[in-house]
């Protein structure tokens, strides 16, 4: 099936209710604890959860539906000050149960992290947002289709710089996703990402990925940036994907949006006004027998 998708969405009003967990370390992804030895309370895991439901109406079909888009639960904690862990499962990803993250994270030296297990690979900006961090009810095509990659492997991360903080991430992975972990691989599958933080509010991210999940090697390149000032958040991202031996047409994907937050005093914390341009050309998962 060939899909050519282009969408422009304007949300006039989006009400957002936020709740902040009162935890000592806010350890959502696995962090280092600055202690030589852990106290009893430090061994207690943190539990995080997100439930997201929605109602959709299809004007062309004159039909509607309710859906539980996400019901995520994650557990994070530490077994040593420099050894953290995370396990996350989605009990209802459009009706499907999916194991998302299952990894251990080490902090061997200052500013260096080593993560091994099942995780989201370092690639793109929007795909790395959890459901409670997303700006729109529906994810962009980059986050959902062409850049949404979780895999099993190892990732190294390093932070440096004071004037312009830089975060580098890169790793090696199976390349076949989460369900085919028993397969043996001869090819090298990797992903890398560099983030530059300019003037505290301007973030630039560059990503590259090369995988061979099926019969055809796929090379992807991504550049994105966002700028925050006052109550505004402006973001743009472009992804370019190619296939070895010109097996399929090259893929282009764009996600750009602007967000303005209006603080509220009662019940809800804010009201957000958003506009987005979101598009993707035809793409394939690398299997010569099918195109999506």
Model segments located where?
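Cleavable N-terminal export/targeting peptides
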Residues: 1-31
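Intrinsically disordered, low-complexity Ser/Thr- and acidic-rich flexible linkers and loops
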Residues: 25, 29-35, 263-268
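An N-terminal domain-start capping segment
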Residues: 28-33, 113, 218-219
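Outer membrane beta-barrel
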Residues: 35-175, 186-188, 195-203, 274, ...
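Outer-membrane beta-barrel and related beta-rich outer-membrane complex signature
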Residues: 99, 126-130, 180-182, 218, ...
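Detector for outer-membrane/organellar transmembrane beta-barrel domains
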Residues: 185, 195-285
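Conserved small/polar residues in nucleotide/adenosyl-binding loops
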Residues: 291
């Amino acid at each position: 099936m060939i899909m050519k998708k282009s969408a422009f969405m304007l949300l006039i009003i989006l009400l957002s209710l936020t709740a902040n967990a009162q935890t000592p370390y806010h350890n959502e992804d696995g962090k280092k604890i600055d202690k030589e030895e852990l106290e009893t309370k430090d061994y207690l895991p943190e539990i995080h959860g997100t439930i997201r439901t929605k109602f959709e109406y299809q004007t062309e079909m004159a039909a509607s539906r309710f859906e539980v888009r996400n019901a995520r639960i994650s557990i994070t904690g530490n077994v040593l000050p420099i050894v953290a862990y995370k396990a996350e499962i989605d009990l209802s990803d459009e009706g499907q149960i999916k194991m998302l993250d299952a990894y251990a994270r080490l902090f061997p030296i200052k500013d260096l992290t080593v993560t091994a297990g099942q995780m989201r690979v370092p690639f793109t900006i929007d795909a790395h947002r959890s459901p409670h961090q997303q700006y729109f009810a529906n994810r962009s095509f980059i986050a959902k289709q062409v850049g949404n990659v979780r895999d099993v492997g190892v990732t190294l991360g390093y932070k440096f710089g004071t004037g312009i903080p830089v975060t580098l991430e890169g790793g090696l992975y199976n390349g076949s996703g989460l369900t085919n972990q028993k397969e043996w691989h001869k090819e090298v599958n990797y992903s890398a990402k560099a983030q530059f933080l300019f003037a505290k509010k301007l973030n630039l991210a560059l990503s590259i990925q090369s995988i061979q999940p099926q019969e055809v090697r796929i090379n992807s390149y991504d550049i994105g940036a966002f700028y925050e000032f006052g109550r505004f958040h402006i973001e743009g991202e472009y992804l370019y994907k190619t296939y070895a031996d010109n097996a399929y047409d090259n893929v282009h994907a764009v996600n750009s949006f602007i967000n303005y937050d209006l603080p509220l005093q009662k019940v809800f914390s804010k009201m957000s006004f958003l506009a987005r341009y979101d598009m993707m050309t035809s793409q394939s998962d690398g299997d010569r027998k099918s195109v999506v």
